[in-house]
UniProtKB/Swiss-Prot annotation:
Gene3D superfamilies: Glu-tRNAGln amidotransferase C subunit, N-terminal domain. It comes from the Bacteria. The lineage of its organism: Bacteria, Pseudomonadati, Acidobacteriota, Terriglobia, Bryobacterales. Its EC number is 6.3.5.-. Heterotrimer of A, B and C subunits. This is Aspartyl/glutamyl-tRNA(Asn/Gln) amidotransferase subunit C. It comes from Solibacter usitatus (strain Ellin6076).
């Protein structure tokens, strides 16, 4: 699958990125490579391979798994205790998206 310059610009717009012409060309090449790699992965025969819920590593299979048990939620006052700014029971944060 070949990605077009128009598609790169569209994705950049969704991510609110301002790319130069050189960056757009480089992204086009990079994204083509990623999509080509994904296409090759899709060709791998996984028949008979059991689905996994997580990637295994050099440890016991259940090393990162624990029972899922409910705990009481953190209270509003405790949650706001270390917030640099808060008001009316909400965190106050600086505006990060301008559109």
């Amino acid at each position: 699958m070949k990605i077009t310059e128009k598609e790169v610009r569209y994705v950049a717009g969704l991510a609110n990125l301002n790319l130069t012409e050189q960056e757009i060309a480089r992204m086009q090449v990079d994204l083509d490579g990623i999509l080509e790699h994904m296409a090759r992965l899709n060709e791998i025969d996984t028949e008979g391979v059991a689905p996994m819920s997580q990637v295994l590593f050099e440890a016991e299979e259940t090393a990162t798994l624990r029972p899922d048990s409910p705990i009481p939620p953190l209270g509003n006052q405790a949650a706001m205790a270390n917030a640099p700014q808060s008001g009316a029971g909400y965190f106050k944060v600086p505006k990060v998206i301008e559109r």
